[in-house]
């Protein structure tokens, strides 16, 4: 039950129910039960789909009590509302008699409102008749009967305001009369008669309905003639249809329902066994309220007097030719006679079973049948069909049956002007009869806008077919036609649901497709013309080949040469080049190298960091699409070596020996493992010879096996974990007999066999030492990795309450052991088995984490999911925030506007969190991709729009986010990083709050640690004092709303963070976007108020945005108005 407050406007009483008389809506009041607890009101709709509550069918049935005129105390206990199916709602269980006095209404489809006025049975004055329906210009007389006389004057009010006063001596036969001459539609409303100084509950309440035309007329200018409604039916002043009283039906209310039935098709039945006794029926205006057929009296419990029938027993039978009067249906004629008064003989022809209304589509040529009986029997030439303009159509065929003749008329192609009342006439020697019926010519729907492209892949297009259209509904089917651009091949067609996005499958890559929508309504010829075309282009074909790394080698301290290969493939290679990725896990840095030639199989990477372990992979790319990555390899770039040895000099000892001497390098980073000596013949063309000095404490060596009388060049370098810089080059000649032989040292053999053996031993020793060094390094790395794995299974983090917490994973639980407390607190989470996760594509990654799309199996069902995981070298702080996010997700529970937890899995000491997969990515990128003036200017100018998203869709994003934040605030969680980048777009374009890594579960959170801050989204108190509350999130929501309206613009674009710190406390705020409605901008300003307690709560924000959605107003203007420009984007500023 809805109670309308006094401040609302009054004209709803006499205007709202004029929305459409054709609506089958009835409000019943049970007057048999005088106790408030047993009294009930029932609202019944006979419309198809009534009360389903969707956009297609309108709002659900609603029962309201209006206290704006008859103000009564609020009930101490609200009445009970019960719904029986989708087309009936009942309210009962009122607390006290005063709860019943006043105006009740039933609101149905299309906003049609039916009113009922209830008078107190114990009032001083009672109305002789509650509802009065009169014509424009008539004189209305309202009669208040005295039940309990008072010696005071009587005040008449109209719509709660003083209208007239009658002296107490002006009563006539115990009645006070109010005459209203020459009434107009503005005279309609609620009237009341009250003794002076008496309680309003003792008043007599009336409802006056004034038709907009004079008697027998209807239409905007009241020039059309009413059809002549029978049995007390009232002609609607707007569309000329008869509003039939309860118990009668038909175009002119000519047919009586069976006893106890009502509704436009007699489909409803009165409750109980006593028929419709004691029930008041209220119908759409201009009918009003009355008793059911066969009953009269203030409580509708008195049967009609003999000779009377119908609603309120207003009709007289006046039966002829032996007919008898039935108080429910009128005259019951004997055999051989028919008509309202049994005045027509059966010899007179009679139209049989003629429907009251038909509907056809424009430009169709339907066949209409008309059946008649009589004596003599009607033949084809005796029947004709008349159009509204008077044109006469003759039947083309007649089917004669024992009890009737059915004539078939072929109607020429229908035009809009053919809508109206048609008439079937039959004429024989026994007389004539006619029956009028209405034909409605409907215009097939035609789309006004083209479908919208939401996402694209190489072989798929995601399309939103929801379009505005001209013509008539309802929409029976939506067809999507598409084919390649400039193609002569046949169109492909699929039937789609207009409320859901559709994916066009099996398309050709990098191909433009023309896409059009066709709408259809029910009936033959209901297919409308195709809507305007739009061009949608598929993405490039994704590369499918997976490269593999052939090898790599270090070419310098910061240079790495990488080579790879591809599997053989027939035909041309699909790809534009290769992307090499080097991931430095220790520093959280990624290096990407683009090789622009698809024929390249090697690349030199420079500028690397010595002494770093890199994870290396390579993948093929085509356009913007990446192929599968090669198996990753772990590459160590040796650390930079020590400085060069000092003061190198050489001395010839013999014709085959030279001694080298040097000093240790200065500030070597670690113990020197060996020295490396380079020997080369001066001026020779051969490669140099290297030899190792494996005893690092020695700073001299003798080079043997040299050629006599030959000049040599020498240099030395030291090695710690890798070789260092070379020393200066020195030159020295061996002793000899004057002969000088040039050539590679490796090609000259020493004369003495012992010297050769010493050189071989030196080389073997050097190789052995190197192998031992590599083995020791591998063992050390294995120990370090084992230690890291152990550390990741159990570690500590600082929780939101400030307590140091130990996290331990086990099957299905995350144990948070807070050190000040002796007992652990296990946090349960839905368990996913490692075998039930199939990893697919990398969605995104940051410095320390990755998000991978995966297919998971949960409760026996396969579903898409996004798997969040930390990288191998994430810090303990990262593990802390990651586990904290799982804790937040577990405590939050499920809500349609947040990214919900699907489960978690622990494998080999690593935690994997599975959350809902959002197929359209984050809201920021989604908004920026919709800037169609930048991506497709021709489309934008052709359709006059700046975005592929409508105003309603943008407002829906904001409403969804507000609902999600309301849920977080009710759970007492503070997000702290609310922005469009942290809102994801899920199925049906629903926005979902995401990224709870910074969320906290306190009412106030004070940040005590350092870290990068989202300054442009932060509230003043957060910037100045590092204090975060739900009201701080409200500030951020205002910035998010600005991002949505600006299609992903950068907040405060062009300003530095330092300027923000200075200007925000000085009341500076972002300006109103030109495409933004004042109401939306005012909501932003409310979120940006200086004092947190003055900002609206999320519940109020969600309610306000919900009302904007229901208003269906373009709050965000996406039209290309003059000098339209998008809000600026500064990616570097968004990082701060």
Curated annotation (Swiss-Prot):
Specify whether Magnesium is a keyword of the entry: no
Instruction: Tell me which tissues or organs this protein is expressed in.
Output: Specifically expressed in developing vascular endothelial cells.
Q: Could you tell me the EC number(s) of this protein?
A: 2.7.10.1
**Domain Protein kinase: residue ranges:** 837-1116
Leader peptide range in chain numbering: 1-23
Q: Where in the cell is it found?
A: Cell membrane
Q: Which residues are glycosylated?
A: 84, 159, 501, 594, 707
Q: Which CDD domains match?
A: EGF_CA (cd00054), FN3 (cd00063), IgI_Tie2 (cd20964)
Which ranges of this chain reside in the Cytoplasmic compartment per its record? Answer: 783-1136
- Residue ranges of the TM segments: 758-782
Alphabetized GO MF terms: ATP binding; transmembrane receptor protein tyrosine kinase activity
Q: List the disulfide bonds.
A: 226-235, 229-242, 244-253, 317-325, 319-331, 333-342
Q: Which SUPFAM superfamilies match?
A: Fibronectin type III, Immunoglobulin, Protein kinase-like (PK-like)
* Enzyme kind, highest EC tier: transferase
Any single Gene Ontology cellular-component annotation: receptor complex
Q: Which InterPro entries match?
A: EGF-like_dom, FN3_dom, FN3_sf, Ig-like_dom_sf, Ig-like_fold, Ig_sub, Immunoglobulin_dom, Kinase-like_dom_sf
Q: Where is the active site?
A: 977 (proton acceptor)
Name used for this protein in its record: Tyrosine-protein kinase receptor Tie-1
What is the source species?
Bos taurus
- UniProt lineage: Eukaryota, Metazoa, Chordata, Craniata, Vertebrata
This protein's gene is called TIE1
